Design a protein with these regions (language model features):
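A generic structural signal for short, well-ordered alpha-helical segments in conserved domains
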Residues: 65-69, 263, 365, 413
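Short, charged, surface-exposed secondary-structure boundary motifs
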Residues: 90-91, 141-148, 198-206, 339-340, ...
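Phosphate-binding loop of NTP-binding sites
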Residues: 4-189
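Short, basic, glycine/proline-bearing loop/turn elements
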Residues: 103-110, 138-143, 263, 299-304, ...
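Structural beta-sheet core signal
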Residues: 113, 132-134, 168, 192, ...
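ATP-dependent carboxylate-amine ligase
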Residues: 1-30, 160, 189, 267-275, ...
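Acidic, Mg2+-coordinating active-site environments of NTP-dependent enzymes
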Residues: 50, 138-301
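Buried hydrophobic packing segments
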Residues: 68, 72, 92-96, 259-269, ...
């Protein structure tokens, strides 16, 4: 009962904020409660009978978490999780306000949480996750993290706080370093997942992990591995298992990595109750996470939304553009504090853009002029630009495609009334 006053205040704040800003504003109540009742988070999560599972890394957290949660739920377990928009510390408090009781009790079997790589270590040390899955370390937000080694160090702290098993990407040298450090602790269990080199078409660019500037470590044997990847389907092997043709929510080898990580994580969570066929069918039926290959019908026509957050995700999404993306809106928002990273991407697959917009729209237009990507207009007023773009005549072939950074994504989705992150269909 000691948390009751803080929870009541937090819920009141949540209602008031939602009245002012539908579909947003969940961070403020969580922030207030985290100051008034800092012990609530650990108290709520550590009482869950199945413990806490953490999924973290630079990219792919939202999709991997959604996949793992869906698999475990299909096995009959109730899972507490956080929306991908609430993956920092106050977001966890906000999720408890929404889904917990007035005393902070969570009536679930276990928690599977997506955690921002900068916040995960602080939270993990308090809640002691049973299982942690670390997806990757990519070059991202240099203004925030300075050096990828700092991210690796933070993720290593999460791994060290894990009580049962740490799942790592065996193709990422940063994850191999984390695993090497963990191996000095005899009681620590480590599992490896990844994409086999032979699974990738020679024309595909490999996933670009952050450099370590250290001697390369030998790759580990992958326990759960993607053995083939074609279009939007994968096959994978795991100990005693071989599964063919799992459909991914969208095209791209990053989705293949998310799927194999989710499969490996769910198998570790469920143990001998894990049903591989059920897991595969669950993955095949899942829609994408919002704005990650999400397709919406607007004005009677399909529009695809693609989120790009850093050089690797921009590159992967551009490489997977097809002729379906025949009319493109490209928006870079104020979240890109250092637009110079835009120049590190190969834009050869982006031949023509209709509209360039966003807080950093002029920077993007300058970039396109430099690299030779044709564009029809620059409109820095984001909401006016998206309205004008969506009002264009339907393309004669393909569909309208919106490529945007996180800030532009949030503003556009709110403007279009897409306030529920779970309201996505396949």
């Amino acid at each position: 009962m000691i948390y009751l006053p803080a929870i009541l205040l937090g819920r009141l704040l949540r209602v008031l904020v939602r009245m002012v800003r539908p579909g947003g504003g969940s961070a403020l109540p969580g922030l207030v409660v985290s100051k008034l009742a800092p012990g609530l988070l650990a108290s709520s999560l550590r009482r869950l009978p199945g413990g806490v599972v953490v999924i973290t890394g630079t990219a792919g957290k939202s999709t991997t978490t959604k996949m793992a949660v869906a698999i475990v739920r299909q096995h009959g377990y109730s899972v507490f999780t956080n929306p991908s928009t609430a993956n920092i510390e106050q977001g966890f408090y906000s999720s408890i306000l929404k889904f917990g009781s007035l005393t902070g009790k969570l009536d679930y079997d276990l928690a599977i949480l997506e955690m921002d790589e900068a916040h995960a270590a602080t939270v993990a040390k308090r809640v002691k996750p049973r299982i942690t899955s670390i997806l990757n370390v990519l070059v991202d937000q240099v203004d925030r993290f300075v050096d990828p080694a700092n991210v690796r160090e933070k993720l290593g702290e999460v791994a060290a706080a894990t009580t049962q098993k740490v799942m790592l990407n065996g193709k990422d040298q940063n994850c191999l370093i984390i695993g090497h450090d963990l191996s000095r602790r005899p009681s620590q269990q480590i599992g490896w997942f990844g994409i086999a080199d032979e699974a990738l078409d020679a024309q595909l660019k490999p996933l670009k992990y952050a450099p370590t500037y250290l001697p390369r470590l030998a790759e580990q044997n992958l326990e759960t591995v993607v053995t083939s990847y074609r279009d939007s389907a994968i096959s994978l092997n795991a100990p005693g298992l071989q599964i063919e043709n799992i459909e991914l929510p969208a095209k791209g080898q990053h989705f293949a990595l998310d799927a194999v990580a989710a499969f490996a994580t769910a198998r570790e969570v469920l143990g001998n109750k894990f049903d591989a066929a059920l897991a595969a069918s669950t993955l095949s039926a899942l829609p994408p996470v919002f704005a990650r290959g999400e397709v919406r019908e607007i004005n009677g026509e399909p529009v695809e939304f693609i989120l790009v957050q850093n050089p690797p995700s921009m590159q992967l999404n551009l490489d997977n553009l097809t002729s379906d993306a025949s009319q493109i809106f490209f928006a870079i928002g104020r979240d890109v504090h250092d637009p110079s990273w835009l120049y590190s991407v190969d834009y050869s697959n982006l031949r023509k853009v209709h509209t360039v917009s966003g807080f950093n729209g002029a920077e993007a237009a300058l970039l396109f002029s430099f690299v030779g990507v044709e564009f029809e207009k620059l409109q820095v007023d984001l909401l006016q630009a998206i309205d004008e773009f969506l009002a264009l005549p339907r393309p004669t072939s393909g569909r309208k495609t919106v490529i945007f950074s996180a800030d532009a994504m949030r503003r556009i989705r709110r403007h279009l009334g897409f306030t529920d992150p779970e309201d996505v269909t396949k």
